[in-house]
Curated annotation (Swiss-Prot):
Belongs to the GTP cyclohydrolase I family. QueF type 2 subfamily. This is NADPH-dependent 7-cyano-7-deazaguanine reductase. The lineage of its organism: Bacteria, Pseudomonadati, Pseudomonadota, Gammaproteobacteria, Enterobacterales. Pathway: tRNA modification; tRNA-queuosine biosynthesis. It comes from Photorhabdus laumondii subsp. laumondii (strain DSM 15139 / CIP 105565 / TT01). InterPro entries: GTP-CH-I_C/QueF, NADPH_dep_7-cyano-7-deazaG_red, QueF, QueF_N, QueF_type2. Catalyzes the NADPH-dependent reduction of 7-cyano-7-deazaguanine (preQ0) to 7-aminomethyl-7-deazaguanine (preQ1).
Amino acid sequence: MSLYRDHQALEQLTLGKTTLYRDQYDASLLQAVPRNMNREPLEIFPDNLPFHGADIWTLYELSWLNNRGLPQVAVGHVSLNAASTNLIESKSFKLYLNSFNQTRFENWQAVEETLQRDLAACAEGEVEVALHHLDHFNNQPISTFTGECIDDQDIEVTEYDFNRHYLQNAAQGPQVEEVLVSHLLKSNCLITHQPDWGSVQIHYKGSKINREALLRYLISFRHHNEFHEQCVERIFSDLQQLCAPEKLSVYARYTRRGGLDINPWRTNSEGFVPATGRLARQ
């Protein structure tokens, strides 16, 4: 399901089309998708965002040449502010990174600065970039989401089409503050309909949310077609509207595709800080 599958902003995307791979730096390969495309149907407007947050990208396949032609490799972390005008389409991001492969840069800082400049221009917003040598990750364990997993419920599931109404009247319990986790989030690319696999962490303070209803709601994304960032904002919006928590944070970490993973988080709590460690499937 998608309300904007044929939106004009999607017509020029390379996603889902045969493309040539370039190995010389080309910033024009980056393509933007307006965030308001999915936000307007959710009644989310840029002058009054109900959340703050970011899209955290991990760049696993990043290589360039130093000024003597010696290949360099790094793992990159990019944080794109959720208040930016656009999100960055992931296939175009991959093609853009490939264009670094045979391009010479003076030093690592030049690569960071190039990435930051180009991504900020494409997104029309704030971007933070950090590149890491591979030994930075020595002895770093696989991380887990903190919180209570809701996946092992003894329920029968027969419906997999998106349905926000599972959350209707789902918050009837006592006042609590808790962190819930599910690894059963699966949605599909808006354009190609390829599956996107993720884990989601929901931290809220408010009336206790029925866990069966919440799990059925998350499972209903299984046939849903949207980009990662849009799914997280939809989850946030639906929980906020239908469960009305006092505080809410939604954070999803998706498995990688094309050497990239995308990990969006949205919160209305000033105290929320997303953990950035890789999960088991990443």
